[in-house]
């Protein structure tokens, strides 16, 4: 009998595949959406900017005038000691947090809420930003980095600016070991080896005098055992469309 596939070992959840969440700085989200923000604004001071191994962008530790503390995804151009504003009457300035309905069209934003008060879900990776396209009553249309246009409630909050850390891809990894440790910080097993390059004991497509699958690559979704479910799973068609 052959060995278990990587997908089977990942499903068991050993330490290799378990996310090292104990190394994370914490959850980066907005403070609760209360009446102070809905009718005015709350001030906060950036007391530190931290590196988070689980993210592609740094996070800022913020102390609010209400006595609360929290982490926020940090934009380009802010520094320790800066004052940020959260609320409907906040100034249109990078780092400030406003409802989408209070942000003018064409302004770049990030860390966008999908439901008012959820803390921010969209556009959080380093160097990313979305654009406010138009306002239509209680709806605001936002163009995401993928090009998709999404309609959101106008009371969903967003941060003005561009996420910091956008130049991370300009520096090459150079060595395979650097890439390995970068992936390990995010619980991603790397490198990813092709099945035909493995031995027969490790994968159904492995083994042989030359690299070939040796069997059909399309398998049923329900009629194959777990160790054989590789390749095109229940595909309607394969190959180049003619």
Curated annotation (Swiss-Prot):
Record GO terms (molecular function): RNA binding; rRNA binding; structural constituent of ribosome
GO cellular component annotations of the record: cytosolic large ribosomal subunit
Transmembrane listed as a keyword: no
Keyword Nuclease assigned: no
Quaternary structure note: Part of the 50S ribosomal subunit. Forms a bridge to the 30S subunit in the 70S ribosome.
PANTHER family referenced in this protein's UniProt entry, alphabetically: LARGE RIBOSOMAL SUBUNIT PROTEIN UL2 (PTHR13691:SF16), RIBOSOMAL PROTEIN L2 (PTHR13691)
NCBIfam families: PRK09612.1 (NF007180)
Similarity section: Belongs to the universal ribosomal protein uL2 family.
Protein name: Large ribosomal subunit protein uL2
Organism: Methanocaldococcus jannaschii (strain ATCC 43067 / DSM 2661 / JAL-1 / JCM 10045 / NBRC 100440) (Methanococcus jannaschii)
Gene: rpl2
């Amino acid at each position: 009998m052959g060995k278990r596939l990587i997908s089977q070992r990942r499903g068991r959840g050993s330490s290799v595949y378990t996310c090292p969440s104990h190394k994370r700085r914490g959850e980066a989200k907005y403070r609760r959406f209360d009446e102070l923000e809905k009718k005015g604004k709350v001030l906060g001071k950036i007391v530190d900017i931290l590196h988070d191994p689980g993210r592609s962008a740094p996070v800022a530790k913020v102390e609010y005038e209400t006595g609360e503390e929290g982490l926020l995804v940090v934009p380009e151009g802010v520094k320790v000691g800066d004052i940020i504003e959260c609320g409907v009457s906040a100034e249109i300035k990078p780092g400030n947090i406003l409802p989408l309905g209070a942000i003018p069209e064409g302004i770049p934003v990030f860390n966008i809420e999908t439901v008012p008060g959820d803390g921010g879900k969209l556009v959080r990776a380093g160097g990313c930003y979305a654009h406010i396209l138009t306002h239509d009553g209680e709806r605001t249309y936002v163009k995401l980095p993928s090009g998709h246009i999404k309609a959101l409630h106008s009371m969903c909050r967003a941060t003005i600016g561009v996420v910091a850390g956008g130049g991370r891809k300009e520096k090459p990894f150079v060595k395979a070991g650097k890439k390995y440790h970068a992936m390990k910080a995010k619980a991603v097993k790397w490198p990813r080896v092709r099945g035909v390059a493995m031995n027969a004991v490790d994968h159904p497509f492995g083994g042989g005098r030359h690299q070939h699958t040796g069997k059909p690559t399309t398998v049923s979704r329900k009629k194959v055992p777990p160790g054989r479910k590789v390749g095109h799973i229940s595909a309607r068609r394969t190959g180049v469309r003619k």
